[in-house]
Regions:
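Sec/Tat signal peptide C-region and signal peptidase I cleavage site
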Residues: 10-14
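Preference for long, solvent-exposed alpha-helical segments and helix-linker "stalks"
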Residues: 15-186
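Bacterial N-terminal signal peptides
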Residues: 1-9
Length: 186
């Protein structure tokens, strides 16, 4: 059961530092429902039942966007898998748009999410944009309204430039591989 409430993350670095998931999802019935949905989507995911994982994942993503950083990694994989298997183009586009929105939402809550993440595991704006560019290029052709190689290239360039500017991390190989492919195709 999904209640009509939406959680909001406040991006204050110290707010969630050192907290556990129970402290970030509230108390009472909402937290019980959210915890149940976390367990349900992870169990379905592990069984590679991505369609079964979708609804409980969506409930967690909507009600508790700062519950766990893994909500975003699992969500990207769940959405990618249901997108690929979906035959109805209207639904396929909706899943694709939801996938792109997942990255926008992660950017919006990045500081709050990073506040309870180990320093070496914290996402940067460049990391998130590069991954969004990868998924746009990989899944967007024939699905995304207004898809273009130039847009994909620009998205990659922004993410990669930010990662390189930051200097703390390397650009993941799969991102570079797709970036080179898009660069060659344009």
């Amino acid at each position: 059961t999904v209640l009509g409430l939406t959680a909001v993350c406040v991006p204050t670095m110290a707010q969630y530092e050192g907290t556990r998931v129970y402290d970030r999802i509230g108390h009472g019935q909402d937290s019980i429902t959210t915890l149940g949905n976390i367990v349900a989507y992870k169990d379905s995911y592990k069984a590679q039942d991505y369609v079964g994982a979708y609804e409980p994942w969506k409930a967690v993503f909507t009600m508790a966007p700062c519950a766990e950083v893994s909500t975003y990694a699992y969500g990207a994989m769940i959405l990618a898998n249901v997108l690929v298997k979906e035959q109805d183009m209207t639904k396929k586009k909706a899943y694709f748009n939801e996938l792109m929105n997942l990255y926008d939402t992660r950017l919006k809550h990045m500081d709050a999410l990073n506040s309870f993440t180990k320093a070496d595991k914290r996402a940067t704006k460049g990391d998130i944009l590069a991954r969004k560019a990868f998924d746009y290029a990989y899944y967007g052709a024939g699905v995304a309204d207004g898809y273009s190689l130039d847009k994909a290239y620009t998205m990659f360039r922004e993410g990669i430039d930010l990662i390189n500017k930051d200097g703390a991390k390397e650009v993941p190989g799969f991102v570079l591989d797709k970036f080179f492919e898009i660069s060659y195709q344009r």
